[in-house]
Amino acid sequence: MNKSENNKTVFLYVILLLLVLFMPAFLGCKNEKADTSSKNEAERHSSYTVTDDTGLTLQFTEKPKRIVSYSISTDEILMALVKPERIAALSRLVDDPGVSSIVEEAKQIPARVQGNSMENVLTFKPDLVIIPDFHPPEMLQSARELGLKVYIYKTPSDIKGVKRSIRQIAALTGEKEKGEAVIAKMEARIQQVQQRLANIPASQRKRVIQLRSEGAFYAPDNSFGDVCRHAGVSDATLELKYPSAMEITQEKVVELNPDIIFVPAWDYDGKHNPDGERRKILNNPSYRGMKAVQQGKVYTISGALVLTVSQYIADAVEEVAKMSYPEVFGKN
């Protein structure tokens, strides 16, 4: 082999050696770029935005895993949409059977929010705080000033609004499909009730009122009125057509003279025992001439159904219908 050929062989050997040494690094770099690209693509697909009822847009790169709920209705909706380990804290009312339908399920999440102090919420290290709009504006502002990711929603006043809230919270938690499943179940139950009531003529439909011993309350838009509409009865208080929400006098209650009186069973202060409330109404001299009192149609009804605005509003429709038309549904 001459000198020229020998040099050529050495050169080729060096090139081959360099390829062997640097090819893994080259491939590794290429794979790293591919992995990074795939990761970025996955993040783009998993990220989403939602806008709350104040117009504030929230950005998420992944589903929230430390959610804090500030109302019983949100508690109930969340428990139907996400696993318990994704909820950091629920509202204190979730443990009250007078207004909560998930007392047992809620035991899986021990933490509770108390009062309106946002500083206390920080201890839960939340990545999402859901607050209904009936809380004080200064509380909502404080939450945002503390850097918390806060979603504020409008409290629903009818079944349509409840479905909207479920869709909002489902989108917020990255669980849209589960949200639609919850709504579908609600709608199916309400439809079944209405089908059973279809043959009751308008002239035989019952007029009802929700009453406590202190009296009744009028609100032009209220969830109980919508429950009544779907349950084949009418909320007699809505006949008053007052310009705004207000208390109803005993005289007006007597004038309305409903077929049925429903007493919400919620002893919220230890002074409103459901049976005691019912007896007070039955024994009130002002009410003795009312047909509901005379016929003994003063019924206690679960506050957990008629006082909250979650998917359990479908249960409220069913319960009101059953209690109003036992001849259709059979006596409990």
Regions found by a protein language model. Give the residues of each.
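Short helix-initiation/N-cap motifs at beta->coil->alpha
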Residues: 53-55, 107-119, 156, 241-250
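Extracytoplasmic substrate-binding proteins
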Residues: 47, 57, 138-212, 216, ...
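Bacterial N-terminal signal peptides that target proteins for export
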Residues: 3-15
